[in-house]
Amino acid sequence: MAEIVAAAGVPHTPAFPGLVAREGPDSETAQLYGQIRAHLEEADVLVMFDSDHLNTFFFDNLPALSVPLAASAPGTNDGTPGMNNRTVPLAAGLGTEVLAGLTERGYYPSRTAKLSMDHSVMVPLHFLDPGERMTLLPIYLNGLAPPLPGAARCLALGADVGAIVEAWDSPLKVALVASGSFSLEVGGPRIADNAIAGVPDVEWVKHVSQRLKQGQAAELVAEATSDRMRAAGNVGGELLNWIALLGAVGPRPVEVLEQQAHLGHSYAAWTWS
């Protein structure tokens, strides 16, 4: 059976690849991603909880939950600076298992047979798999367009995804990843003049990071209402990706937690051994 070997949460700021290209491997961003990457070295497959930024899906067909079944997908589809476009191999067999397993458990995921991926997937992949050796299964949660999925449902979803992965008839090793920030406003009214993004709720970032540090998933779920997440920014629902990850992690303590509250996010890692 497949084995989960690690879990991690990272931001996907689209400026980061270009920033690291300019500043080099000693930059703070490169070092933080490097810490997380070290925890994922055993993995053959990355399962990534992600919220698309209306580049893979749009309002005419925007699922609350979607599992790709494609064998590969190109990215980036949004012109992220500092990155080369490439075609990423997807774990279609695992996708089929996850789709079936979640449906049997009472979820209603859409299936995606053809897709392209934006920076929310490709930036983490750029830093966590620079050798391009892993296959990927993105699991899309709607974290942007209300109504958002409930936090408790996302926690349960993560636990079920973990169980499905561990029951997958495969010798491969799997790492689970959450992609996103805790507080972020993009192109909205709560940013500085002449800025394209900002962090409207630094204290929420600190609070969420403390919940992660203390392993308080249930408390975080109770606090992460749709209104509370939206108060943290128009993409504050990306927190749901982290909550899904916590469902899979269970009671395991976090091993790495590096907070960048002024940027709206943290980096975190858990290992299973």
Where in the sequence are the language-model features?
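Flexible, D/E/H-enriched segments
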Residues: 1-43, 59-156, 167, 189-273
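Glycine-rich His-Gly loop
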Residues: 12-13, 51-53
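Catalytic metal-binding/acid-base residues of hydrolase active sites
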Residues: 52-54, 182-183
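Non-transmembrane, aqueous-exposed alpha-helical and coiled segments at domain scale
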Residues: 144, 159-174
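Secretory-pathway/luminal and periplasmic proteins that interact with or process carbohydrate-rich
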Residues: 184-188
